[in-house]
Amino acid sequence: MPKQDSLWLKSLRWIQKHLVHTIVVPQDPFADLNLDASRPLAYVMKTESLSDIAALSEITTKLGLPSPYEPLVVNGVVAPRVVCLEGRKPLFGERASNEPFLECFMRLLAVHKEKPELDIQLVPVSLYWGRTPGKEDDTMKAAVLERENPTWLRKCLMILFLGRHNFVQFSNAVSLRYMADEHGTDMGIAHKLARVARVHFRRQRKVMTGPVLPNRQAMFHSLLKSESLRKAIQEEAASKKISETQARETAIEYLDEIAANYSDSLVRIAERFLTWLWNKLYSGINIKGAEQIRQLHHDGHEIVYVPCHRSHMDYLLLSYILYYQGMVPPHIAAGINLNFWPAGPLFRRGGAFFIRRSFNGNKLYTAVFREYLDQLFAKGYSVEYFSEGGRSRTGRLLAPKTGMIAMTINSVLRGIERPVTLVPVYLGYDHVMEVATYHKELSGKKKQKESVWQVFGAIRKLGNFGQGYVNFGEPITLQNFLNETAPNWRTEVADDPEQKPTWLTPAVNVLANRVMTRINDAAAASSITLTSLVLLASEQNALERCLLERQLDLYLTLLKRVPYTSFTSVAEGDGKHLVQQGLELNKFSIHADPLGEIVSIDANQAISMTYYRNNIIHLFIIPSLIASCLTNNKQISRAHILGIVSDFYPLLKAELFMGIKDLPSYVNQVLDLLIEQGLVQESDTLSVVTEHTSQMLLLAGSVSETLQRYAIIFNLLAHRPKMERSELESESHLLAQRLGALHGITAPEFYDKKLYNTLSVKLKELGYFSEKEDKSDVERIRDQANSLLRASVRQTIVASVTAEHIV
């Protein structure tokens, strides 16, 4: 390798500085890969390349990593900082030998044998000039821009045409100390290291570029030849009394309507546009958990992303983040309502495939869609779909639609060999631009049909949207899930492939709820969501600034010291910082008087802010319920609090998709923290410390509307033990409207009929609609709910339930 200060390398670096734009994956290798700055470090690259090392040099300088041009000097042994598996590929003739690099491995291993305290980190580094996976019939482009083993001439063309799309990916470091101790230090180990590294680089390339893209028409013909589609076409022809040719043409029309037409060129253009858009809209995108997903890709998993659905921005945000995290944007299941010009064709070329809201018993369409989905899985394309079926209008997760999850499980049952893994994804925003529209729809206004004019209208409103949040939850590998749910599933399916297993529908429902729970497990507690939670729990949606900051400090401490899950993310900074962020985004108002500053939510903004509160209310609902028990009882035991929480938790779990694994432990940890913070005191019983009553009342306020709903339900059940589920749902909704009108409750979810349906289903599951005469459980929970309400609210509920027009 020429010297760092040689004229040739200086010239090369100057040229690349102007032609090359490099994206680093991950953005912070020290933090994401746990690199140790105190230990020696060497880089491992697949192929010796001056241009690759020049690009790496630029990045290492910015990141504070050792330069690849600086030799590695350890205990008097001098070795190159970069170890390559292959020599350069010349324009003609044979590739240069890699023996010098293997000798470097040997020297480094030998030093470890002599120095037991030494531990060099070997960091694999992959460089990609463009990320085009290529097409099945794209031979000319592959010949000109062959990426894996280019000659210097091809590399020059790649830098010229693809230099603005250069990616440098760092991987987890390998400990040479571990290798030397476990496997020895001879030449055989050096060769083994090289072989393992080659496999790593091959897998890494597939993660970065994805599988080869199919020719769309060729794929259609291949799908139409499948046994299941041939059978579906024959049945369509017989049932509709048409020819098989006509039925086949219908199937082709369905395929054309459904199938994506992924274009790498469009993705590159979209990447530039979206970079501009995110920089204009957001002050930052916070990402948590991407490394575990990269590893799943690397290990050969078929990945299915299942995000929550807040906004049309979701389609763009997740694909963009995955692209910049070194993964291929997924094929996205989009509603057919988004297939309008010009967005539809663009979405399709960006990887969207379109699905009808309902298949309406259309067996041919179902067969076509199922076969297409199977093909995506078989070819190794990652897939994304929204299990809620539509965007949440309240900020809470919607009950899942199970159709796509059922189809995914059926694909596994039909014999996908690779592990298929669902990845729950929490998407959050400091500002959702559709929130105002959502509340109009909830108040009865008809939903507008998507069109190009809506797009232009949205663009006009672009402004400072704060920050976005992408948190990857705990993955669910379907083969493992099936082993847990139905241990003999492989045998059952093999014995009778056409027979639907009796356990399948319950398993799909369990899986769908588990996905939603793990989405909520990965929630992002941000400045906007936390501040909304506090202010909406106050009497007039207003607090003195110092009190608001103090309450936020308490919530931050609670989330950090008693974490909801390890996948949850918490805003950086203290309460003062969070309030300032909210004010800068104009989400809250501030008024000064001689006694200080008051932060409030304007009356016309209060309903909108419930959306952001609802994103994270599940994180605080148990602490809030605990606070409600404490503030409504002068003295109360831990056992009594745990009993109340345990009674309400099944309903909270169903309503808010909660997944606390050890409820008693969690309750005790929250109580211990409240005692440690000086808010609660404990002798034989627990009581609120008088000077901190206001803080405890604020914490208790977040659960008040939920308790009011439960009080309505259990007062009705206790008063009319034999009422039907449908009656309970309709009368609960009617009573909620009355309560809201009398007591000023404006939260949209309070009047959501679907929520009362969810609760009634859970109540039936728990046995509250049984024919048993003993209703002590219902009466106990009714009394508990009533005891935690304000007297005026309790009186309204009790009086309304016993009134003639209700019964």
Swiss-Prot record:
Record's keyword annotation contains Cell inner membrane: yes
Entries under InterPro entries matching the protein: GPAT/DHAPAT, GPAT/DHAPAT_C, GPAT/DHAPAT_LPLAT, GPAT_PlsB, Plipid/glycerol_acylTrfase
Subcellular location: Cell inner membrane
Pathway where it operates: Phospholipid metabolism; CDP-diacylglycerol biosynthesis; CDP-diacylglycerol from sn-glycerol 3-phosphate: step 1/3
One Gene Ontology cellular component annotation held by this UniProt entry: plasma membrane
Keywords, sorted A to Z: Acyltransferase, Cell inner membrane, Cell membrane, Lipid biosynthesis, Lipid metabolism, Membrane, Phospholipid biosynthesis, Phospholipid metabolism, Transferase
Pfam families: Acyltransferase, GPAT_C
Biological process terms in GO annotation: CDP-diacylglycerol biosynthetic process; fatty acid metabolic process
CDD domains: LPLAT_DHAPAT-like
Motif segment (HXXXXD motif): 308-313
Bilayer-crossing regions: none
Gene Ontology molecular function: glycerol-3-phosphate O-acyltransferase activity
The enzyme's E.C. designation: 2.3.1.15
Catalytic activities: sn-glycerol 3-phosphate + an acyl-CoA = a 1-acyl-sn-glycero-3-phosphate + CoA
Membrane topology listed for this record: Peripheral membrane protein
NCBIfam families the record matches: plsB, PRK04974.1
PANTHER family for this protein: DIHYDROXYACETONE PHOSPHATE ACYLTRANSFERASE, GLYCEROL-3-PHOSPHATE ACYLTRANSFERASE
Free-text note regarding domains: The HXXXXD motif is essential for acyltransferase activity and may constitute the binding site for the phosphate moiety of the glycerol-3-phosphate.
Family: Belongs to the GPAT/DAPAT family.
HAMAP family linked: Glyc3P_acyltrans
Protein's name according to its UniProt entry: Glycerol-3-phosphate acyltransferase
Organism encoding this protein: Shewanella sp. (strain ANA-3)
